[in-house]
Amino acid sequence: MRPFLDDAKRRVDRKLSASRQSLSTSRLLPSALPDRLKDNHDAQVDFTAPPGGSGSREGHLQYMQQSIFGMIAAVGSRSDFHARFDESSDSDGESEQRPRKESSVRKGTSASANTSSPLDSSQRSSSRTDGKSEKESGTRGRRHPRTISDHKLFRPFESNSKHEPQTDPSTGDEMPNISPPTRPRSATPRAAPILSRMVEAQAQFDLKASSTERSQPSLDESGEKGPRGASVSPLSTRLMDMFGFDKPEKVLVEYACSLLQSILLQGYMYVTEGHICFYAYLPKKSTVAIKSGYLYKRGRKNPKYSRYWFSLKGDVLSYYADPSNLYFPSGHVDLRYGISASLGEAKEKGREPRDFQVTTDQRTYYFRADSSMSAKEWVKALQKVIFRTHNEGESVKISFPIESIIDIEESPMVDFAETFKIRVIEDDDSYAIDEYFFTFFNSGREAFEFLRSLINDQSLKISSQHLSPQPDRSPRSDPTRKSRNRWSLTSGTSRVLGNSRAETQRKASASTSHTSLAHDVIKSSPATRHQDSSESILNSFEQGTESSAAWQSMTDAAESASQILNRSDVFQSPTIHGLDRRPSGGERRGRRNSDETARSLSTRANVGTGQQIDELGRRMDGDTSGREARDSTGESDQYTQDPTKSFSGAPSLNELVKAGVYPLQRAAGLAEYLRTRSKQMSNLLASESMGYIEKVSGMWTGGRKHYGEAEDVLPDDQDVDPEDKEDGCNYGDRFRAHFALPRTEKLQATYFAYLHRVLPLYGKIYVSQKKLCFRSLIPGTRTKMILPLRDIENVEKEKGFRFGYHGLVIIIRGHEELFFEFRTSDARDDCAVTLHQHLEAVKFMAESGLLAEQEQNDSEAAMTEHRMLQEARYDDYGENDLRPLNESSELHPIFDDPRASIVNFKPAESLRITCLTIGSRGDVQPYIALCKGLLAEGHRPKIATHAEFEPWVRKHGIDFAPVEGDPAELMRICVENGMFTYSFLKEASQKFRGWIDDLLSSAWASCQDSDLLIESPSAMAGIHIAEALRIPYFRAFTMPWSRTRAYPHAFAVPEHRMGGAYNYITYVMFDNVFWKAIAGQVNRWRKNELGLKATTLDKMQPNKVPFLYNYSPSVVPPPLDYPDWIRITGYWFLNEGSDWTPPTALCEFIHRAREDGKKIVYIGFGSIVVSDPSALTKTVIESVRKADVRCILSKGWSDRLGDPASAKPEVPLPPEIHQIQAAPHDWLFSHIDAAVHHGGAGTTGASLRAGVPTIIKPFFGDQFFFGSRVEDLGVGICMKKLNVSVFSRALWEATHSERMIIRAQDLGARIRSEDGVATAIQAIYRDLEYAKTLARQRSIASSTPFSPTPSAKTTAEQDADDDVEDSEEWTFVGDDTDMEMSRRLRDRAISDADMLPDRLLANSVPGDSGPGRKLSGR
């Protein structure tokens, strides 16, 4: 595993060293630019300004303010609320604070480096310098002045645990020293456990007490393993090593089966000459959500149930008030400390319960599901997680002697599998009987018959040995039975050595934090007992209060104290440790039982008197069976009856010192108990290091802290949070307890800041290896935020909302921005630098479920053990005789994989699919790609668009239907007015009212004979045509059109980030403004030609329509608040480059530039309107020369719709620029180093797919949106103005910024791996039934025949129609969310899918030929 980690680190080092620069922003510093690229006199001039105003040349006319939303933003920017968005925010903290930021980074790096030895520091620094810096400087030929601390970047990913030697010469103990991740006492004080609750929990788990209660394995110390002769098979040898047999045993037979407990464990059963063994390999993943959904939760004090969205991921059950805001949990249940999960009692007879509860060591949580089946599923999932957390590891091993088996009987549970039960006697002392259930999906009858015959042969022997035992038989007389009959869940690193002492077989089952099912066999060795007895004095001083409660609960338990204590995860460590927290290595190994297993009864028995123990034994003799009594004496009396076993020899000096400081420790323990248990006493006691007022004042002063590898504060950081130093608690423990994070999550830095949501909320920011967390500090608030760093796209600095504060914006994938405010610019800048450092580190580190190096090693070891076992099987039987587990034990379909679908969504018949769109070439091209995919699927697609695209469409074998409208004229309106702005709609309604009428009528005619309609919403007619034809209707578009808080509407992108509320309102306003502008003409058209009644925006419900977005989820991640009928499929690319032959002149120009060592850029703004095309051409020429690059130019701004008044002679092009007329993007962009264009959806997708940095100069429409996305992703630059100063600097940065180049290449690789057309087709299949349901709802609401001419109606019929219109039967009403409604509609659609043709036929008028007929009126 180490070589893999080293290689990964070297790869990341190589990528990061190439992009060494300031991390406070995503752009290069001005100091890194050549002097020739400094600002000139034209820095504020925009040569791409449209005609129509003299002020445009001075840059005062902004394109976004041509929209109605731009006017709102322009007016609002004059208020104090938008003062933070002034242009000075771009330079705030940039030039003045950069030296300070750099020095702080260097200072933090040096401080952290000083914590290690000078030799280590010198070695690390030399290796970094020689291995990365010099190599990169030699290969790249340049070095950026800003550097990143590699030590800070990659320190968190290394394991911090120091592995202790696993052998002690004095004791011969080989048990590893693994410290459990105990919960911080100050954060979560642990109450005295109630043993009866744990007994009930174990019964509900179906983990029988006897199955986990094993006697200590005892082997003859002088005995040796049997010789491994030449006849011993590899499988026998492997089983001997894995299960600790004395000698290799011949394998008689093996079966693939499953162990049935509270969960189903798939594995193998091996039947040897003396044992029946079971082995299951359980790889774990902690980053995948196991289950999620809505549940009701009861409050701690309020009996009312509240509805939350729950998500079970890893070891934590989190719940959220809003399922679309998963970064702000309302709370969580840490299942690492869980005891049980069980169903509640049924409140009504004959009805199964919907309530269930989860019990932890702190409290019991009560939940209520929507149905009894859902409650059962949740309980099953929770039991599985608790089972795994209590028994941490990656393999399950069970073995029991054949002679201990009492009987075997069938236990049928399901029809498709054979299940039988094996009853086994545990040992001679307790006579306990274990029951094991094994399920076979194949060969079950054969296995049952074989085992039954094997057991019957020894039935008399078993009866004589176990039912009539000899009273004087010692446990050591039969070592086989007691040492083999055990259950363990172990990681691959835990091996049982047969020739070692009995103590060596008690190695920790799990390599991480918790005890395993084998913890009942882990007992103290003599050396350990001696250390525990001395330590118990100190424990008794601080645990007196809890011990008394524990004694009382022990006497009332249904099982013996030793049994529960040895199997309890709650007793894994003392609640209050001793004051001496730095024991020596030998002491740590001697006291490992207090860290890895439950604190045994011996530690308290040494404190109590012999009378207490005797009284406890008498109570247990009277209340329990002989088994419990024997266990209690076996576990406790052996330590108390002979005190010399615990206190052998004279007391050591260390023990005398501990006993001497008893008064101080007693007082400290009492103060600790009162402080952690009582809020009132904590306010009264003056035991803290500073007063309450001083502590609060320190918190409100704000500040920052950085933490080293051991999570200690670096010396240069001021101490502003003295609470962290209290309780002897590690700095990171409190952080992990607040957010229920694993031990592998190491704290890196903390800051005090305000989080702006509705109101500013003061709290603390935590930065760890892979998380950004926030916790409110205002009394009465419980806001918490857990944000994975991999979900953060960028971090930007802005002015604060309030005067004197400094803002920081966190841009999140698929989520609205988060705004933080800091009191000082230093803290804000330091936080920005720290976040950028961690973002760079996690950028190329793919997160898996195994984060820590130790966990990776353990997983590798378990996987190696599993692989070696498989190899041994194949060596014994050959590949033809054995089938792998995944084939031989395949689950029945009742155990359905949620990731796989059980329904074939592809329709059986070929569909007639019409794609309706208007606009430019970029609007039509994606539909050609989609239709080519539909043709390959056997469907009959057709594209309805402008007539000038007909040859292009038909060239690809796609049917075509014309739609009225001149795209050139439409382009002129869009450029001059902004796309779908108020001025656009006003001019269109005045000058193009007839154009809209022709568009609607021609679209209606073109969409006839269709079974499915897919429309760009800009065409305006599709939803009404689908309602009239009563066919399923989809929408598809190249820009965001659905309401979300993550992104603003593509036509209303603000100058600065406005937050989620503004983003959402832009969609609402646009929908209403757009509909108001066309409502009159559309309703007239509906009545006259479609035969439909007038409609409104509420009746249409456009937000319920299934939507396909043809851009990449890597470019525009799906927002968390999108319903499940909205899908981002990926780009629909039309690859035409393979059929295109480039001109010779173009190839020679590219070849010449490569020989000269010059970068090549493409510049083309498409068909735009500018006031002075010649001036724009001159600007491009000067910028190319100034940036010292070569240019391939596509000059569309002077070819179409130019201003005749500005016509001037063409400017001659220098040899550095080669002009082309047209070239396929997929070919051209693969031969350049950077692309400059207008930011259209198709062109942006093509340049990003090629993996080249992209410079965007937006003009109108969605171009502003994609420009902002490119800049947020760090793969390009969005220019607000175009002049020589700005353009030349952007060209140089795009071709020289290694950071931008690497990000663009990474994004391009992800886009090329997508198949947007195939994903879109599958989305159509999946949502087709849902779309049919919506069509049925609309047809019921309209209930009018397909006739453009209204038929004569009676008064009653007219009144009935009016009732239908008023009722709005198909409008969604209620509190259901979109996702809930979609699920209900899907369920209804599945049951009613076959009714649609009959209903459509019944609703049609006589003589109709069906939905696809043409209207006679046309």
Swiss-Prot record:
Enzyme Commission designation: 2.4.1.-, 2.4.1.173
Biased composition (Acidic residues): 1358-1379
Listed PROSITE patterns: PH_DOMAIN
Molecular-function annotations in GO: sterol 3-beta-glucosyltransferase activity
Localisation per UniProt entry: Cytoplasm; Preautophagosomal structure membrane
Keywords: Autophagy, Cytoplasm, Glycosyltransferase, Lipid biosynthesis, Lipid metabolism, Membrane, Protein transport, Repeat, Steroid biosynthesis, Steroid metabolism, Sterol biosynthesis, Sterol metabolism, Transferase, Transport
Biased composition (Polar residues): 18-28, 106-115, 209-219, 486-497, 534-575, 599-612, 635-651
Sequence segments annotated as region (Disordered): 1-59, 83-188, 207-233, 462-651, 1339-1418
Sequence ranges of Basic and acidic residues compositional bias: 1-16, 35-44, 95-105, 127-139, 147-166, 578-598, 615-633, 1380-1391
GO biological process, one term: sterol biosynthetic process
Coarse class of the protein's main subcellular location: cytoplasm
Ranges of biased composition (kind: Low complexity): 116-126, 508-519, 1341-1355
All residue ranges annotated as the GRAM domain in the record: 249-288, 733-799
Binding site for UDP-alpha-D-glucose: 920-921, 923, 1223, 1225, 1238, 1242-1243, 1262-1263
Function recorded in the entry: Sterol glycosyltransferase responsible for the glycosylation of ergosterol to form ergosterol-glucoside.
Name used for this protein in its record: Sterol 3-beta-glucosyltransferase
Species this protein is from: Neosartorya fischeri (strain ATCC 1020 / DSM 3700 / CBS 544.65 / FGSC A1164 / JCM 1740 / NRRL 181 / WB 181)
